Design a protein with these regions (language model features):
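Hydrophobic/aromatic-rich core segments of domains that either
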Residues: 140, 145-152, 163-173, 179-203
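A short secondary-structure junction motif
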Residues: 156-160
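N-terminal accessory/pre-domain segments preceding catalytic cores
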Residues: 1-147, 151, 155, 175, ...
């Protein structure tokens, strides 16, 4: 069918663009993610961000261990890519993106991650939280959909850090609970969110 043909081309697009994509793993990386995930569970008005990062550096056991570079093309499974393709196609029928060409869809909605964060299955997590906001027949354009999502994101705690304890792209499951972070962290959160809702965006 035509749909199967497009999905095959989508898979080819991802594979052709994977050659130089990678991510870091290791005990130091996992330790940092666990620390940030735990801190993001704390709700308060203000955060002493330099103190929080200094605490991590003091407590970290594996900070000096070199992480391992993993290449997407060698580590991501076919099932992972297929699930991402299926979930991306599921939102390519919204009023605000039906006009997109296949090439535009591949460029703006299909990608499975933003930067060098650890790849994970993230779209369902974001869809559950944000898609209900767009279930309104009056939302017809990408600009309208984008405003709805932005209005919701602005309600999140926004505390901008000038540096982080480790220069990592945070994974989507961490970002969705953000309490503070780099400007890029908030931008990546918005991109993940809008991409999952079928709003064509990029950085």
């Amino acid at each position: 069918s035509q749909d199967d043909g497009l999905r095959l081309r989508a898979a080819q697009f991802l594979l052709e663009n994977m050659a130089d994509k990678g991510y870091l793993t290791g005990r130091s990386i996992e330790e940092y993610y666990n620390f940030i995930d735990s801190v993001y569970q704390i709700k308060q008005e203000e955060y002493d961000i330099p103190y929080i990062y200094a605490t991590f550096r003091q407590q970290a056991k594996y900070l000096k261990e070199n992480p391992v570079l993993n290449w997407d093309v060698q580590t991501l499974s076919a099932d992972y890519l297929i699930q991402n393709i299926d979930e991306a196609f599921a939102v390519w029928n919204r009023p605000w993106n039906r006009h997109l060409t296949f090439e535009e869809f591949c460029e703006w909605i299909l990608p499975y991650r933003v930067g060098t964060e650890i790849p994970e299955v993230w779209r369902a997590l974001y869809r559950e939280r944000f898609e209900p906001l767009l279930m309104n027949d009056s939302i017809r354009t990408a600009q309208q959909a984008c405003k709805v999502i932005n209005d919701e994101l602005i309600k999140l705690p926004i505390h901008i850090a000038t540096q982080s304890a480790m220069g990592l792209c945070l994974r989507p499951s961490t970002l969705i609970n953000i309490k503070f972070g780099l400007c890029g962290d908030y931008a990546n959160l918005a991109l993940d969110d809008m991409r999952d809702c079928g709003i064509h965006v990029g950085i």
